[in-house]
């Protein structure tokens, strides 16, 4: 994840988690270790917390 400001707004956070959860539900491999069966949204949250989510946030100036 690459950003100019390291703090995400709640809207950016929701968008990232939703987009990544959709990818995971469509068959994308999770980038964090999963010990139990988790919901795609929970997996996406875990990826965001560990900062391994493969998505970028671009903000217009």
Curated annotation (Swiss-Prot):
InterPro entries in alphabetical order: DNA-dir_RNA_polK_14-18kDa_CS, Pol_omega/Rpo6/RPB6, RPB6/omega-like_sf, Rpo6/Rpb6
Q: Which reaction does it catalyse?
A: RNA(n) + a ribonucleoside 5'-triphosphate = RNA(n+1) + diphosphate
EC numbers for this chain: 2.7.7.6
Q: Name one GO cellular component term.
A: cytoplasm
Which Gene Ontology MF annotations are present? Answer: DNA binding; DNA-directed RNA polymerase activity
Record's signal peptide: none
Its BP terms in the Gene Ontology are: transcription by RNA polymerase I; transcription by RNA polymerase II; tRNA transcription by RNA polymerase III
Asked if the Swiss-Prot or TrEMBL record annotates the protein with the keyword Acetylation, the reply is no
Keywords in alphabetical order: Cytoplasm, DNA-directed RNA polymerase, Nucleotidyltransferase, Transcription, Transferase
Which PROSITE patterns does this one have?
RNA_POL_K_14KD
* Pfam families named in the record: RNA_pol_Rpb6
Q: Where in the cell is it found?
A: Cytoplasm
HAMAP family registered for this protein in UniProt: RNApol_arch_Rpo6
The record describes its quaternary structure and partners as: Part of the RNA polymerase complex.
Concerning NCBIfam families, the annotation shows: PRK01099.1-3
What does this gene product do? DNA-dependent RNA polymerase (RNAP) catalyzes the transcription of DNA into RNA using the four ribonucleoside triphosphates as substrates.
Belongs to which family?
Belongs to the archaeal Rpo6/eukaryotic RPB6 RNA polymerase subunit family.
The protein's name in its UniProt record: DNA-directed RNA polymerase subunit Rpo6
Species name: Methanothermobacter thermautotrophicus (strain ATCC 29096 / DSM 1053 / JCM 10044 / NBRC 100330 / Delta H)
């Amino acid at each position: 994840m690459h950003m100019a400001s390291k703090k995400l707004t709640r809207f950016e956070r929701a968008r990232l988690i939703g987009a990544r959860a959709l990818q995971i539900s469509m068959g994308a491999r999770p980038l964090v270790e999963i010990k139990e069966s988790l919901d795609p949204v929970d997996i996406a949250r875990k990826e965001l917390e560990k900062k391994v989510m493969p998505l970028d946030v671009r903000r217009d100036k």
